[in-house]
Curated annotation (Swiss-Prot):
Membrane topology reported for the UniProt record: Multi-pass membrane protein
UniProt-annotated location(s): Membrane; Secreted
Protein name per UniProt: Molting protein mlt-10
Functional note: Required for the efficient removal of larval cuticles during the molting cycle as well as the synthesis of new cuticles.
Record's signal peptide: 1-18
GO BP annotation list: cuticle development involved in collagen and cuticulin-based cuticle molting cycle; epidermis development
Entry keywords, A to Z: Coiled coil, Developmental protein, Glycoprotein, Membrane, Secreted, Signal, Transmembrane, Transmembrane helix
Tissue: Expressed in the major body hypodermal syncytium (Hyp7), the dorsal and ventral ridges of the hypodermis, hypodermal cells in the head and tail, and the pharyngeal myoepithelium, but not the lateral seam cells.
PANTHER family in the record: MLT-TEN (MLT-10) RELATED, PTHR21523
Glycosylation sites: N42, N204, N305, N415
Lineage, uppermost ranks: Eukaryota, Metazoa, Ecdysozoa, Nematoda, Chromadorea
């Protein structure tokens, strides 16, 4: 396959692959180890996991590219590309879907939607350097471009606009100045401070008093954070859906659909709760409906517009007292005798601003105003409620990131250092520095497109001499790709689509890695083109895992059934088998050499060119398993009948058979050569040339 240069994803995956150190395992699954969970993987599982991660990384990048370009397509074409991506079975097929998208874009089929007219106003008017080249049209553009800027400095008198001149500052000269001291504070200010201290003493508060401005600022910050979180939640749901729709089912991170479903269920539960609250409110609002109708009738008689009045919220004789944020203009709200009075801010309009406490306290100096505002905020318990709300908000966020026992569901620098050592700490610090170095443009690209490109300085930090991920060759290559990197991504996607197959690298052989209680299901990849040496299998069934070129040497099997797992060119050599039946698993070119066995029935599993050599067997019957070119050589057998298993060209050579039977198994060209039969029967099994 062509050398791929996908920026960042390939490099990170390669670095991670290089640093994996798989361990031998005694059991498989999550194990509680102190304050963390440990999942032990053998070498095969580690390689398979890395293969999966790399495939997900490539598919993730391609899904991000598709999400960016697919927005320009009509809805029906979007569905075609998304369905193609969902049906893809591997990275190569996914890349082919992307190539169709890229080709359509190049051919101009992904232009603006039909009948959509885009009008773009230039931000800057560029005029020719030579004044003689100016045309009347150019001058009109220049005049119109500056009109908006000039209008900002106009003061209108009737229908005439006059430019406002900048006011000059008047300089005052004095012979001396008097500095204020604490004794100069007026009585009202002292009273406010005294009242504030009294309230704080009653609440047993000893910490620094929080100014009212800070309390109001915290409230605004909480409100903005709640809005931002709601917006981020919607963006996250949209992004997850796009990534899932544009990623093959094979490579979808299983956590993403779960997260999307969970988010949707939470939203549904919130909506249900709102509807229930609304229903309860409706039950007690029956008398209020008469009031609403009366108000509506009065307004109609007064000649006022009552359009959509029934859909509006009626606020009647319900003044807001000491509000902490300004009243928002809301067209869905009908306000009747419900002003905002004595607000703690000086914003808003009309009565709200005139009656606000900062406005009423303007007769006092700044110290007096702030002192009385501090008292009012403290007496009302605003700071305490803000602190409680912040605590609830913080605990909710922390709860989402921790397990039921309070253990974080993620690696922190502290626990990673404790578990994995200082080397892993240095790796985490590299990514901490990298995260802090992102520019606003990079953050925007990450949010909008799902990927961004590193600067040379960032690449130096990640792959340079001082980094634990030091990779000089990769660094040089990535620096060369800084010119139009998206072109290289497109080039590599096309290379993936044309490749015959996609693999990380040649699979390493599995050596000295026991499999205990480790079911191998759909494990064709790690069992093919791999030597398995000195790796016993115990209680580890192999199911739906065909294997090609996967010899197993010096690796005994104990209670390892082979089910629906054909094997080709995968001999077993010096490999004892105990209670390991072979069921619905044809063996082709699969010799068994020095493979003694006990209780290993072969059922519905044809054998071709799979001789048993020096492999004594006890209670290993062949049932409904025809075989050809499958001699038994120096392989004595006890209690191993052939039942409904025709065979041809399969002589039995120097292989005594005891308690042996051939039942309903015709055979041809399969003579007995120096092989004594003891207590043997042949029933309904004709033979030819044997």
């Amino acid at each position: 396959m062509r050398n791929l240069n996908l920026i960042l994803f390939t490099a990170l995956a390669a670095v991670t692959y290089a640093n994996v150190q798989p361990h031998d395992i005694s059991q498989n699954g999550a194990v509680k180890d102190g304050n963390h969970l440990r999942i032990d993987l053998n070498e095969t599982s580690s390689v398979e996991l890395m293969d999966k991660w790399l495939s997900q990384a490539f598919s993730g990048l391609m899904a991000a590219v598709a999400s960016k370009k697919i927005a320009k397509m009509p809805a029906e074409h979007q569905n075609i590309v998304q369905q193609c991506s969902k049906d893809a079975k591997d990275v190569r097929e996914h890349a082919k879907c992307l190539v169709k998208l890229l080709d359509a874009e190049k051919s101009g089929k992904l232009g603006r939607k039909q009948y959509q007219k885009v009008v773009k106003s230039p931000e800057t008017i560029v005029l020719p350097e030579n004044p003689k080249m100016l045309t009347k049209k150019d001058l009109e553009k220049a005049e119109n471009a500056g009109a908006a800027e000039n209008n900002e400095n106009l003061e209108w008198i009737g229908s005439f606009g006059t430019a406002r001149a900048k006011r000059s500052y008047k300089v005052v000269h004095r012979d001396s100045y008097a500095l204020r001291s604490t004794d100069d504070v007026d009585g009202m200010t002292k009273l406010a401070k005294s009242l504030t201290n009294t309230v704080r003493a009653m609440k047993n508060k000893t910490e620094r008093a929080e100014p009212w401005v800070e309390a109001v600022g915290r409230i605004k910050k909480l409100g903005e954070e709640a809005k931002r979180e709601k917006k981020n939640r919607e963006v996250m749901k949209k992004r997850l859906k796009q990534m899932i729709d544009n990623t093959p089912a094979e490579f979808v991170d299983p956590r993403k659909p779960v997260a999307l479903k969970q988010a949707e269920m939470e939203d549904e539960n919130n909506e249900i709760a709102k509807l229930m609250r609304k229903k309860e409110a409706d039950e007690i609002r029956v008398p209020l409906k008469f009031l609403r109708k009366a108000v509506k009738t009065a307004l109609m008689l007064g000649g006022q517009n009552v359009t959509d009045f029934d859909q509006k919220t009626l606020k009647m004789v319900s003044p807001r007292m000491m509000s902490i944020v300004p009243e928002q203009e809301d067209e869905s709200l009908f306000n009747l005798l419900s002003p905002s009075l004595f607000s703690l801010h000086d914003e808003g309009e009309g009565i709200e601003k005139l009656t606000s406490l900062p406005h009423l306290l303007k007769k006092l100096d700044n110290h007096g105003q702030n002192a009385w505002m501090d008292f009012i905020v403290e007496a009302a318990g605003v700071s305490d409620e803000v602190t409680k709300t912040e605590k609830v908000f913080r605990e909710k966020k922390e709860k989402e990131l921790r397990g039921t026992d309070g253990v974080p569901l993620y690696f922190t620098k502290e626990n990673a250092t404790k578990i994995l050592g200082n080397e892993e700490k240095s790796k985490i610090e590299v990514f901490e520095d990298l995260d802090k170095s992102y520019s606003e443009e990079q953050k925007k690209k990450l949010n909008d497109d799902g990927f961004a490109f590193l600067t040379e300085k960032q690449m130096e930090r990640l792959y340079g001499k001082e980094s634990p991920y030091k990779h000089t060759k990769a660094l040089k290559k990535f620096k060369r790709l800084r010119d139009d990197p998206e072109k290289y991504i497109e080039k590599d996607i096309r290379a993936l689509a044309e490749a015959e197959k996609f693999r990380v690298a040649r699979r390493a052989d599995i050596v000295s890695s026991p499999f205990i209680l480790t079911p191998l299901t759909f494990a064709s990849a790690p069992l093919s083109n791999t030597f398995i040496v000195l790796s016993p299998l115990v209680l580890s069934p192999i199911t739906l895992s065909p294997a090609v070129l996967g010899p197993i040497i010096l690796s005994p099997w104990v209670f390892v059934p082979l089910i629906l797992s054909p094997r080709v060119l995968s001999p077993l050599i010096v490999n004892p088998l105990v209670f390991s039946p072979i069921i619905l698993s044809p063996l082709v070119l699969h010799p068994l050499i020095l493979v003694p066995g006990v209780f290993n029935p072969i059922i519905l599993s044809p054998l071709v060119l799979s001789p048993l050599i020096l492999s004594p067997q006890v209670f290993t019957p062949l049932i409904l398993s025809p075989f050809a070119l499958n001699p038994l050589i120096l392989t004595p057998m006890v209690g191993s009948p052939l039942i409904l298993s025709p065979f041809v060209l399969s002589p039995i050579i120097l292989s005594p058979q005891a308690l042996f039977a051939v039942v309903l198994s015709p055979y041809a060209l399969s003579p007995l050569v120096e092989s004594k039969l003891i207590a043997a029967e042949v029933v309904l099994s004709p033979s030819w040339l044997s």
